[in-house]
Regions:
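Cytoplasmic juxtamembrane regions at transmembrane-helix boundaries
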Residues: 114-125, 129
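Membrane-embedded alpha-helical transmembrane segments of multi-pass integral membrane proteins
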Residues: 98-101, 127, 156-159
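Transmembrane alpha-helical core residues of multi-pass small-molecule transporters
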Residues: 8-11, 55, 123-125, 152-156
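Transmembrane alpha-helical segments of integral membrane proteins
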Residues: 102, 128-137
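Short, glycine/charged-rich beta-strand-loop motifs at protein surfaces that mediate ligand recognition
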Residues: 91-95, 105-106, 119-122
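Small-residue-rich hydrophobic transmembrane alpha-helices
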Residues: 4-61, 65-67, 98-112, 116-117
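Interfacial/gating helices of multi-pass transporter permease domains
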Residues: 1-12, 79-86, 113, 147
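Short alpha-helical transmembrane segments in multi-pass integral membrane proteins
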Residues: 29-94, 135-187
């Protein structure tokens, strides 16, 4: 268990800056939403998405490449180190999608869509992870336990991507509608 705890701590080191960035940037999206400034919203959303995804991909790649030196900062026991290194690698396989999940959750909250935000937010450590962590260890033992985190992360990322593309489509339609309305009023 100490090895998995090390892997989770390393995972949180990457997750917390992304979460903090999204919480801070949420106010910009909320302001744009309230002002119906869809150009500002799209510009801010694309920037948020770029920053969160770039950071999460870079962080996960760095952890996968440097898993052993990172783990050795927490433990000098070889057995713990071996398990922690493999745990780090598995936990970070799909961590690049965490940036998307965090961005989508913040965006939905800024738009006042709390229920949909909860669906995205609870996927990763809730309704996708709990069944996986109960089922996969029975089927594949400890490897199944480790895989359950990666599988839940992948599933949550796919849900977040689907919702994100849908929300961007709605924003673009609102922008076109607002533009056509402005032309209709002016003409």
């Amino acid at each position: 268990m100490a090895a998995v705890g090390i892997a989770v701590r390393i995972l949180m080191v990457g997750a917390l800056p992304i979460t903090g960035f999204c919480i801070g940037a949420q106010a910009i999206l909320g302001f744009g939403w309230g002002a119906r400034d869809y150009v500002r919203i799209l510009k801010a959303a694309k920037f948020m998405l770029f920053v969160t995804v770039a950071f999460s991909i870079a962080y996960s790649a760095a952890v996968v490449v440097f898993a052993r030196p990172l783990v050795s900062l927490f433990s000098d026991n070889e057995n713990v180190t071996e398990i922690a290194v493999s745990s780090c690698i598995v936990f970070h396989l799909f961590f690049g999608l965490f940036g998307v999940q965090s961005f989508v959750t913040a965006m939905l909250q800024a738009f006042g869509r709390a229920r949909l935000s909860a669906i995205v937010a609870l996927a990763r450590q809730g309704y996708l992870f709990i069944p996986a962590v109960l089922l996969f260890p029975v089927v594949a033992g400890f490897d199944g336990l480790l895989a359950s985190q990666a599988i839940a992360e992948l599933g949550a990322g796919m849900i977040a991507l689907f919702v994100m593309f849908h929300q961007f489509g709605e924003l673009r339609r609102a922008l076109r509608h607002r533009g056509s309305r402005a032309i209709g009023i002016a003409g």
